[in-house]
């Protein structure tokens, strides 16, 4: 279920009211200046008073941030590489790449760069954790891009909240080589070692999880879900790595505060990045795309992301 916490509601309202105040006052000052020029009013206009000059500077910086967030940051993919060591592997290591929240739109955004980066990383496994499409016109471009990803040990995916809504009948990942996972585990073997990849499709109500617990504790297990909302239910020795997305890292974040909104039941607790919850490592990926319209078509201090995990024996 998609939720928004009271704290997020308050922070979003404060942010919007602050924007309204700054740009509302700026509009009034500019209108006063223009009317004064039209009427040839004598005297110094408030537009050039020192406090107003400071306001102009803030407004200009804000416009610059919005332009950067729309035209620049959504295209600056961050490759976040991590090494996880485990006693559950003896000889072989696995390179796993996670993508999420592609939100492919009418206009191409990051698809070509995603393919170039991922194939250059030479992963063993690629996993995708939901929300693939914003507009049906991008369906073939999405499929072509995902089909071109090379992963010799397999490509696996789970559904996101958008995938069970508008696009449920489209067969979004048909012909891409990705295998949907829903309440099942696939064992991937390399050399003499193996890891388990399991997944749970998104549900609009709280999904019962009894059938996805109890994984073998002597094997390294990766769990895929769209949101971080199940982490405190499934964390434990049977789930070594929990991979998700959904939050976009807030998509718009503020310095020293972080995400304004995550649409997770945990609010800002697991907004983006790496967390250790009990015996489980959680990674919340910021994703590659933007919320569908009328959501904001900007990213600010929350760059699109590809996550890379090198899962290695402790001895390496």
State each model region's role:
Residues 102-107, 131-135, 200-204, 219-221, ...:
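Short, flexible loop segments at the rims of nucleotide/cofactor-binding pockets, characterized by
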Residues 78, 88-181:
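Membrane-embedded segments
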Residues 85-97, 178, 185-198, 217-218, ...:
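Beta-strand-turn-beta hairpins that frame and shape the catalytic cleft
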Residues 212-224:
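Short beta-strand/loop segments at the ligand-binding rim of alpha/beta enzyme cores
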Residues 99-104, 130-132, 160-162, 184-185, ...:
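Active-site metal-binding loops of divalent metal-dependent hydrolases
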Residues 96-98, 125-127, 197-199, 222-226, ...:
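Structural motif
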Residues 147, 228-311:
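Conserved beta-sheet core of the metallophosphoesterase superfamily
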Residues 1-77, 316:
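Non-catalytic terminal accessory segments
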């Amino acid at each position: 279920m998609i939720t928004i916490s009271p704290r997020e509601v308050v922070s979003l309202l404060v942010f919007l009211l602050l924007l309204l105040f700054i740009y509302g006052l700026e509009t009034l000052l500019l209108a006063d200046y223009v009317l004064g020029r039209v009427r040839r009013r004598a005297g110094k206009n408030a537009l050039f008073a020192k406090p107003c000059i400071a306001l102009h500077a803030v407004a200009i910086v804000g416009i610059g941030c919005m332009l950067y967030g729309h035209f620049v940051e959504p295209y600056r993919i961050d490759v976040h590489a991590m090494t996880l060591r485990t006693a559950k592997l003896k000889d072989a290591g696995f390179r796993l790449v996670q993508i999420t929240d592609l939100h492919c739109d009418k206009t191409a955004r990051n698809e070509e760069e995603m393919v170039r980066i991922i194939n250059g990383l030479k992963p063993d496994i690629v996993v995708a954790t939901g929300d693939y499409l914003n507009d049906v016109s991008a369906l073939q471009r999405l499929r072509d891009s995902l089909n071109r990803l090379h992963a010799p040990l397999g490509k696996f995916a789970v559904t996101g909240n958008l995938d069970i809504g508008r696009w449920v009948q489209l067969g979004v990942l048909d012909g891409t080589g990705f295998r949907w996972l829903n309440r099942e585990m696939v064992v991937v073997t390399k050399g003499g070692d193996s890891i388990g990849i399991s997944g749970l499709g998104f549900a609009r109500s709280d999904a019962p999880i009894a059938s996805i617990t109890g994984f073998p504790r002597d094997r390294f297990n990766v769990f895929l879900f769209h949101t971080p909302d199940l982490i405190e239910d499934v964390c434990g020795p049977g789930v070594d790595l929990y991979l998700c997305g959904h939050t976009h890292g807030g998509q718009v974040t503020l310095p020293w505060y972080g995400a304004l909104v995550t649409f997770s039941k945990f609010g800002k607790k697991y907004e983006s990045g790496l967390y250790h919850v009990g015996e489980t490592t959680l990674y919340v990926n910021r994703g590659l795309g933007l919320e569908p319209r009328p959501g904001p078509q900007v990213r600010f201090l929350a760059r699109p992301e590809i996550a890379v995990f090198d899962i290695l024996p402790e001895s390496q």
